[in-house]
Structures are given as structure tokens and as C-alpha cells.
Amino acid sequence: HPFVNHPFEVRDDEDMQKLVDSIKENGVLTNLTVRPRAEGGYEIISGHRRFHAAQLAGLDKIKVQVRDVDDDQAIIDMVDANIQREHISPMEKARAYAMRLEAVKHQGRRTDLTSDQLGPKLTAAEKVAAGVQDTQTQVKRYIRLNSLVPDLQKK
């Protein structure tokens, strides 16, 4: 099953066709990352494009790595796996960063995950910016795009 509210669009474009051709020739080289769903089945955390391409290539089975993670960690993992991709629209980044920010804030309540006795405590926005190519200021600006009226978000 796809990730609920997945902010990254899976496009049937030239890049997708190249991925389909590669999968037909070589198979899926990187496993999808999934997690068990309470109602049964699995939810894709990372690999939506590979999954779609595998379907287009006619595969009925694909290898996965199963991770038992909570909602917040699943969001963080999903954003981290996708944010470095090329051809991500500003709105995709905006939605992804906003989702990651909320997940990081939730984890901030769990001191076992965020307390560091030796170093300074990072803000949630600093944690979102860590490990991505955008600065903390850029991350905040992207997140503000979510406040645009829906018609402007589509442009």
C-alpha cells in the first residue's frame, strides 16, 4: 500500500520509462522499504517509484526490507529517502519538510531519542535541515509554501 499522504508525485514521464526499461533488463536493484500495517499488508516507506515501475514492467513480486517503525519514524525515513532526488517540485519539498518537521517535533517529546548530554539541543527546524542540501532558512521558506492558496500550490 502507498504511504498515506505521500508528498512526492510518482510521474509517468521519461525518467519513469527509463526506470521501467532498467527493471525489465536488470530487475529491481534496491529493495523497497515497507512496514507492517495494523489492518494487514504493508505500507511502502521508500520505493514508490520503483514499485510503480516494477508494476509497469510486469513484475508481480518485488523484494522488500521490512522495518517496524512508528508513524513519525516512517515519515522521517520516507522524506529522507526521497528529498535528495532530482526533479522535486517546490511544493513536494514544502509538504515533505512540513511532514518531517511535525514528526521531529513529536519525537522531541521523547527524551530517549533527542537528549544529548554533551551537545546543544537542536531546534526542530535545525533537525529537518540536517542531512539535506537546504539550509534551515530554506527549509522554513519551503514549509511556508504550504500556506499558499491551493490554486497557487498547483503552479
Predicted feature descriptions by range:
Residues H1-R67, Q73-H87:
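Short, charged/polar connector segments at secondary-structure boundaries
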Residues R11-K18, H48-R49, D70, A74, ...:
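Charged, alpha-helix-enriched surfaces in structured cytosolic catalytic cores
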Residues D15, A38, D68-V69, D112, ...:
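Residue-level detector of alpha-helical recognition elements and their boundaries
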Residues L59-D60, D68, A103, L145:
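A short linear boundary/processing microfeature
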Residues R85-K155:
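Alpha-helical interaction elements
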